[in-house]
Amino acid sequence: KELLSKMTLEEKIGQMLCFAFHGTEYNEQLKILIEDHHIGTIIHFARNIENLDQIYKLNKAIHEKSKYPMFIGLDHEGGMVRRVMEDITYLPGAMALSNATDEELYKIYNQTGKELKILGFNMNYMPSVDVNNNPYNPVINSRSYSDEPNMVSKRGGIAAVAMQDALVLP
């Protein structure tokens, strides 16, 4: 409440916005978004991530240059949707994890969350809680835990709690 009371209207509006950008280092585009428009969230895509050292430095610069705490996110749900590809625990897709115990599922998502947090991320656009109601759908298929809504809900809940416990917002 105290922080909000000190913000201008422009800063409050900026905090509600999420932007992607081009590049792999802190550049003029990011400067304008963060320092001039005070946006609240940056999302990284594969085009922004080269290696662990680079993404750590980029995220550190984003956090340091922002006047207000930033959300820095990525889409790292596992399987074919992974943005950090090297030197991080491999996270299989949801279907591949469908036979894991609840404890195993929690551990792998929590470990992934801890690794993302070390790299400067505090938001992960996951889990996918799509129900695989059409096995021929090429977009959902292996990204779903099951064709049973209750199972998808339970597994997605475990993944979300594991990320939250690693201080990464799902």
What do the predicted segments below correspond to?
Residues 1-25:
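Boundary/entry segment of secreted carbohydrate-active catalytic domains
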Residues 33-155:
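Enzymes and membrane/adaptor proteins characterized by extended Gly/Ser/Thr/Asp/Glu-rich
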Residues 9-13, 34-36, 65-66, 164-165:
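Extracellular/periplasmic catalytic domains that process cell-envelope and extracellular macromolecules
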